[in-house]
Amino acid sequence: MIMRGESNTYIKVKSVLDNSTPEDAKRNKNLIYLFTLLKGSSLIIPLAYNGLIMHENILILCWTAFSVIYTVLSMFKVLDVLEGETVSHSRYIYLAYVFGNLIFALSIIFHIM
């Protein structure tokens, strides 16, 4: 159910931001936070589930913990941007996150680890 709603998350947040002034966006930041939280939970729940199933492998358990922490921290960056702060992402950490999730998914599919 949450996974199906994830595709509309960016559309809803973008429409709220496009159709409002900066003052209105600050008032609607709880709504934007809710959409971001739903998107993050749709990623965290499968990662935690896979980490619990495959708990005999310490690498998968560590990667699940890192992914959950990174996802939660990136969700809070939305609120910082609404407050007017500029938030820079570390390109190397983001690339490690993307490629790590790719390796994680392939290891589940092909039972490599």
Curated annotation (Swiss-Prot):
Annotated protein name in UniProt: SPbeta prophage-derived uncharacterized membrane protein YosW
Disulfide bond sites: none
Gene that specifies this protein: yosW
Transmembrane feature ranges: 34-54, 58-78, 93-113
GO cellular component labels: plasma membrane
Bilayer topology term: Multi-pass membrane protein
Cell compartments where the protein resides: Cell membrane
Main location as per UniProt: membrane
Signal peptide: none
Entry keyword annotation includes Thylakoid: no
UniProt entry keywords in alphabetical sequence: Cell membrane, Membrane, Transmembrane, Transmembrane helix
Keyword field contains Transmembrane helix: yes
Highest rank taxon of the organism: Bacteria
